[in-house]
Amino acid sequence: MSERSARQWPDFLSVVLLALLLWISLFCGWRALMFCCASVFSVALCVAADCLDALIMSCRVPEHFARFVWPLTWLGSLSGLGLAVMATSQLKTGPEHVIWALAGLLTFWLSFRFRARLFG
């Protein structure tokens, strides 16, 4: 996988995740809407980590800020996974498969970043 396509995956994932959040909020009510707000925060943490990583790679931000990339990614992905687990217990009538798909995408995002960091 080229470096350019590896950089485009996080952008694609954020669009997919935000579309899923919109779908959940439209069809599941207020609890789902609160879950979506928390999920947007989770996705924002992952996007912030990607932006910081891109700024470091382009030498616009000093290298010593690289220590914040992984904590932001882990915090965003794990909080999204935790939100998905909590939401499935709260949203009894909601589409649980969509919520678990969100958790799966956040976990995939984390593993993709790990793989790109090791072999990139």
From Swiss-Prot:
A GO CC term assigned to this protein in UniProt: membrane
Entry superkingdom: Viruses
Induction: Expressed in the intermediate phase of the viral replicative cycle.
Main location group: membrane
Protein's UniProt keywords contain Hydrolase: no
Cellular location(s): Membrane
Keywords tagged on the record: Membrane, Transmembrane, Transmembrane helix
Keyword Transmembrane set for record: yes
Transmembrane parts of this sequence: 9-29, 32-52, 68-88, 94-114
Membrane topology, as annotated: Multi-pass membrane protein
Protein name according to UniProt: Uncharacterized protein gp19
Organism: Escherichia phage Mu (Bacteriophage Mu)
